[in-house]
Amino acid sequence: MPVSMAVCETANVVNAALRESLGVGNGSRAADEAKKTGGGGGDDSDSEMHNQIAVSAYAKRILMSKIEYEEVPNYHDSVLEQLKNKYIVIKQPSNNNNSSSCNGSNFGNSKVVGANGHDNGNNGHRKLTQSESTQSGPSPNELPKPKRVLYPRENIRIGWKQSERKWQVGTGMINVGNTCYLNSTLQALFHIPALANWLVSEQTHLENCNITESNGGCIICAMAKTLQSTQSCQSAMRPFHIYSKLKQICKHMVVGRQEDAHEFLRFLVEAMEKAYLMRFRNFKELDQLVKETTPLNQIFGGYLRSEVRCLSCSHVSITFQHFQDLLLDIRKSDTLEEAFDGYFSRERLEDMGYKCEGCKKKVSATKQFSLERAPITLCIQLKRFSMIGNKLTKTISFKPRIDLSRFAARSPAAAAQPLTYRLVSMVTHLGVSQHCGHYTAIGMTESGSYYNFDDSYVRPIAMQSVCNTNAYIMFYELDLSQTTPLKSNGLRLTNGHSQVAVPATVSSSSPTHTRFIGPQLPPGGINGYSNGHATGSSNAQKTAIQFKQQQQHPQQNGLQVGTGKFQEPPHAKSPLAGAYNKGEAFPATTANGNKSSSSSASNSNHNKSVNQLQHQQHYLPISSEDEDSEDGATATATATATARPTAQLPSMPKMTEDSSDKPKTPLKSSVKTNLVKSLLKTPLKSLVPYESASEEDEPLPNPRKRRSDSDSNDSGDSDPQPGHVNGHTKTNGGSLTNGNGLGKAKTILATSSSSSLASASASAASDDEDADEEEENSKLTNGWQPQKQSQSLTQSKAPPSPKTPPSPAVIKSKTGIWKVTRNDDNEDEDDDDDEDEEEQHQVVSTPSKNPRNPFAKSSTTPGAKRQKLLNGIAVKSQQQPRVGNGYQSEASTNGNVVNELLKQTHRGYGSASVLSWSGKPAELEKELVAEAREQRQHDHDDEEENEMDRGRQRKVKSATAKAYNSSTPGYNPFQEYESQKRWHKSSNGGGSFPRYHNQNFRQNFQQRNKFKYNRFGGPGGAKFQQQRALQRHLASGGVFNRRQPTGQQQQQQSQQSSS
C-alpha cells in the first residue's frame, strides 16, 4: 500500500539538525564524566537538564523547517531504512560506513556518483559546500536518477553491423487464423536492430531459463526462438511460440479474433518487461525508476519534459514523464513533421483549470512537451482510429530520416546532441475501420533495402513506395552515423571511449571548386569505390558537403572498432540526409543499392558502412520499377501532349485510331478551326426546309458524324483539303470532294460540346466493321471513288428514310405541315437498326422508288456501305430512342438548325439530357426528374381530388375509350358476364338458386353503386349513362340474351304452359 514519506531535501535538513544537537549533547556528557572521574561527584540532574536545554534550543529550528511528503510504493524500503539510519547515527556518530543519504540526495553536485546515483564519500556524511548551501536538495529541473540500473544503456547495440552474425532478410509468417496483426507486429519488432541484437544476446538465459510454464520458457525466450526461426527457416514459419502464449500476453485477447496491432504491441512489450524483472528476487520491491532501466525500456523508453507555465505569475512547473511511444494526432497534419510540430507545440489549458503552486489558486496556464531523454528506438503511432471504430485514411507523408533536435529540452547536453533517426520498420493497416482490414509490415534489412512482409509473402519494396505507404505504426532508430559521442544526462551513448568529432564544412577544398547539389561522381570515378568503401583516404571527398581530413581508423560497418568495443564513426551529416532534408528526391534502391540483386551475395557487402552506402546512393541514384513506370508514364504523357495539341473539354473522351492503315501524319490545326474556315467559304442557306424541293432532294451530311469522325482521327490524319467534305483522306491517298457538304456546317459551332460525346461510340463501331468489310470493298472499288460518282452524290441521292414511328412528329405552322427529323448518333436499340442505317447512308447513286416518300426502301450493297465508312459519313453508333411530348423520334442524316436547337432545349420537343462538365447528369436535372416523378405519383394517388378541383369539364367521346376501366376501379365486366351466365343457367335449368334472388342481387348492386362512381359527373353525364347502359346490358346476359321477364311474368308463363 502506498505510504507517505518525507522528501529527501527536508530529510537532509532534519538529519543535520539532529546531528548538531546530538553532537552538543555528547560533548556536555563527556565533560560531566571528566568531572566525575577527576574532581569528585556531580549532580546527574544538572547534566540531564543541560541536555534538555540543548535539544530544546534546536527543536525550534527543526519544527520551523518545511516538511514535504511524497508517495512511495513500499514501507520497508522507505521508512524503516530511514529509521535505521537515524539510529545508527545516534549510536556511532563518528565511525559510520553506512550511507545516511536517501535516494537521490546527491542530485545537485557535479561529482561522479556510483551506479545507484549516491555519493559514497566522506563516510556517508554529506558536507554542504558554499554553492549547495542555498540549494541543498536535487534540482527540480533535472531528471532523477535511479538507485540501481538493471541493464546499462551502453550495452544496447545500435545498428545491424554491431552484431557478429550475418542477418538475413527473414522468412514470412503463416496466418493461422486472423493473426495478421501478430505477424506484422513481430516482423516489425524483429527488424529493429537494437531489439534483435538484444534477443540474440540472451542465448545464456535461453539455455538456463528457470521459468517453467505449461508452454515452456518465458515470453523473452519465445521471442528469441521465433527470431531464430525466421533467420534459419527457408520457407514461411508458424509463430506458435507467441501464438500459444496469447492469453499470457493479454487475457482479453481471443484466439482467432482480429485485434489491434498497436494494442498487441503494448501488451507484448509489457509482458517482456515483466519476464525480465522476474529474474530478480526482490523485483516487487524495486521502485519505478529502477524498473525503467530494463532492456526494453532502454530501447524504447524515453522521458518527456512537461512545462506548465502560469499566465498570472509566470511560475513554471516542470515534471518528467516516461514514454515508450508517441501517439501523434494527424487530423490537422499532412506530414509527419507537421504532426511532430503539433505534438510539441505549446497548448493552452482549460481556462481557470490549473492550480498554480505560486499563486495557490486556479489560473489559466500553458503546457508544452519537450524531449528530455530521447529513446534509442522511437515508436510512433498515428491516431487513425476513433472510439467508435472509424478510420482516418488520409495519407501522411514522411521521410526515411527525421531530425528531432529542435524538440529536445533546452539543457546544454541535450541541445548539443543531434537526434537523427532512420526508419527501420513499420506496420500498415489496409481497410476502412478497425473491425476489418489487413495488417502488413515493412522492415529494413542489413543491406539497407526494405522488404514488405505480408504474412507468408516477402518481397522487396522501393524507397519511394515505402514513403508513400499509409503507415500506422513506425519505428525509427537512432542513427549513430549522424551523432557525436556526447553525454546525455550522465549516460554516454558510446562505451566510454572518447573520440574527436569531425565537423562538416560546406566550403570547398579549392578556391575554384563550386558547390554542387545533386549526384556527383567521386574524384576517382566509379573505380574510386569498392563495394561502397572510399579508396581515397587522405583527400576529402568532393561532394555537396565535404569533410575535413581525418585520421584513419579500422572500421567495420560504419562504426569504429576500439578495444573490443564498437565506437561511433566521426562522420557528420551525410550528403544524402542533407539533400533529402532540402526536399530533393530520395533515391530508391534495391537490395544493395544496385540495380541487380545478385551483388548482395558478395563476401564484402556486410562490411559496408551505412554512411558509405548513403554516399554511393547519393553519387549513383538507382532507378526502381516504380520510377521506371513513372518515367514511362511521363514519356507517354509528353508524347500524347505533343501529338494532340488540340485543347479538349474535360468531358470529351479520348479517341483512338479506327484502323492501323490510316495515315499517321500529325494534325496541324484543330477541327474547329477547319470548320470555321469552311463556314466562311460556304454561302448561307435557309434554316428550316419548309417547302423547298431542291433542298429536300439534297442530302445534308450529318454534322455530328463529321465532327466525331474528325475527332476520332485527330491524332493521325493530315489537314483536310478545301475540297474535302468530312476532313478525312482515303486509305490509299485518294480524296473525295463534295461541294455541297458544308451546307449546314454552321450548326457544329452550336453543338461542339454535345457532338463530342457520340464520337467515342462512332469510332469504336467503325473499328469493328473495318476488318469485316475491307476485303469486300477492295473487290468493288479498290479503295477509290470516282469523281463522277462523288458529284452524283449531291444530285441523285435519295433522302434518308427514317423508321416509321408510332406517331410521326408533325408540327403545324402557318406555312404548312412539316416533319421534325433529328440527328442523334446515340440511338440504336436492336440489330434491325443496323439495316436501316445502311438504308439511310447510301453512296452508290441508285435511284429510289419514291424520293418524296419517307418510308420508301432502297437496296444497298456491302461495298456501298464500306465506301461510306471510308468517306467518314456513315459511322454506326449505339442509338437510344428519345421520347419527347409522347413522340418517339429516330435518327436521320439531315442535319439542320431546327434539329440541333430542338435537341438542346430543356423543354418542348428536345430531350432534357443535359450533361455537366464531368459527363454526368446535372444536379438540377436530377431534381427536376424527381419532382416530376413525385408529381405524377401525387396525381395518380389523388385523382378524385384533382378532378374535384378542376370542376366540370367537357368529356370527349372516343370510340376506343373504355370508361369502365378508369371510372369503376375493381369492376371487371368479363367477370360480371360470366357470373350472369351462371345465374341464368341455374334458373333456366331448375337449379337450386331461384331467379328472383339474382334479380334482387342486381337491384341491390345497382342501388349501392348508383352514386359511388358518379360523384362529379351529374345524373346526366355521359360517363354515368355509359356505365348504367353497360350494367343493364351485362345484367341481361350480354348480346346473346334478351331482357329476362320479371318474376310475375314467369309465374304467368308457367301457369299458361301448365293449363
From Swiss-Prot:
Q: Which CDD domains match?
A: Peptidase_C19E
Q: Where is this region: Disordered?
A: 24-49, 94-148, 505-673, 687-893, 926-998, 1012-1059
Q: Is Oxidoreductase tagged as a keyword?
A: no
Instruction: Assign the protein's first listed, main location to one coarse class.
Output: nucleus
Spell out the GO cellular component terms annotated for this protein, sorted alphabetically and separated by semicolons: cytosol; nucleolus
Q: Where is the composition biased (Low complexity)?
A: 94-123, 540-560, 592-611, 633-647, 729-739, 752-765, 1048-1059
Q: Reaction catalysed by this chain?
A: Thiol-dependent hydrolysis of ester, thioester, amide, peptide and isopeptide bonds formed by the C-terminal Gly of ubiquitin (a 76-residue protein attached to proteins as an intracellular targeting signal)
By its UniProt entry, which PROSITE patterns does this protein fall under? USP_1 (PS00972), USP_2 (PS00973), USP_3 (PS50235)
Q: Which residues carry this modification: Phosphoserine?
A: 508, 510, 692, 694, 766, 801, 807
On assembly, the entry states:
Interacts with atms/PAF1, but not with CycT.
- The name of this protein is Ubiquitin carboxyl-terminal hydrolase 36
Gene responsible for this protein:
Usp36
